[in-house]
């Protein structure tokens, strides 16, 4: 079973642009953990701020299961949940989320028993719920049967907005969810962590780096930069984009605008899988 690796920062410690306070974040993480646990998936929860007792979180999850109906409680298998503390002096809020999350991933990949046993992982931003996660994992499993899959992600890489003279970036990697073998991550992604910085003057966002990885591996055996399945995500986004273009920049993944976009993109993945919109 491919383990889900949930990345978590309970306390961003004043990181510029980070949304939600500590109590809100904790509740979001608990909600996401419960969602994936109920599906019987293998889950690795990795936290890098050191602001929460992971043993206590585990106990809280147990109480949550006991409080719910028996049918829900029976879905929880705590043998399939692993809590990893990856806090340390490397955390640097002055570099932003991409830099710190990549360090988190490197430490978690090496510390997690589940990931080491599987040799791969499916990364998800820990506050979010990928509602059709089973479909994405099924797609990865099928690809792995036909070839040795080492990397699968999503990206936007088109010139539509440029043609329409719209001030929107049509070239960006998807960092909220992706799949990688341990070897791929350690050799193709981790060595570039020090390039990452969310702030001027040397901006390199995680989305920029992911797009570069997608482009560099496009067409290579075992690498995919487009899922056939459109991920359906629930939860609030952690960015401050705004710009008044709610259809393009909404931070609410449950909004009507993003649900419409999600539906349109699924159709395009079926009929024009080569068009990365």
Regions found by a protein language model. Give the residues of each.
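ER/Golgi luminal nucleotide-sugar-dependent glycosyltransferases, focusing on the catalytic module
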Residues: 1-277
């Amino acid at each position: 079973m491919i383990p889900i690796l949930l990345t978590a920062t309970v306390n961003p410690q004043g990181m510029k642009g980070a949304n939600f306070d500590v109590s809100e974040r904790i509740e979001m993480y608990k909600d996401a953990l419960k969602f994936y646990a109920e599906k019987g998936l293998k889950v690795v929860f990795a936290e890098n701020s050191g602001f929460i007792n992971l043993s206590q979180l585990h106990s809280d999850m147990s109480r949550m299961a006991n409080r719910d109906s028996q049918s829900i409680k029976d879905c929880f298998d705590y043998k399939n949940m692993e809590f990893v503390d990856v806090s340390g002096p490397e955390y640097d809020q002055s570099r932003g989320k991409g830099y710190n999350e990549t360090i988190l991933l490197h430490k978690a990949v090496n510390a997690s028993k589940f990931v080491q046993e599987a040799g791969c992982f499916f990364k998800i931003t820990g506050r979010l719920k990928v509602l059709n996660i089973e479909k994405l994992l099924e797609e990865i499993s099928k690809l792995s049967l036909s070839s040795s899959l080492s990397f699968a992600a999503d990206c936007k890489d088109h010139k539509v907005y440029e043609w329409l003279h719209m001030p929107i970036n049509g070239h960006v990697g998807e960092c909220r969810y992706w799949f990688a073998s341990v070897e791929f991550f350690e050799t193709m992604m981790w060595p570039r962590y020090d390039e990452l910085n969310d702030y001027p003057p040397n901006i390199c966002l995680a989305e920029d780096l992911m797009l570069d990885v997608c482009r560099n591996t496009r067409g290579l055996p075992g690498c995919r930069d487009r899922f056939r399945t459109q991920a359906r995500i629930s939860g609030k986004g952690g960015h401050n984009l705004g710009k008044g273009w709610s259809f393009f920049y909404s931070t609410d993944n449950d909004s009507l605008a993003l649900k419409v976009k999600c539906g349109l993109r699924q159709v395009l993945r079926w009929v024009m899988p080569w068009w990365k919109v």
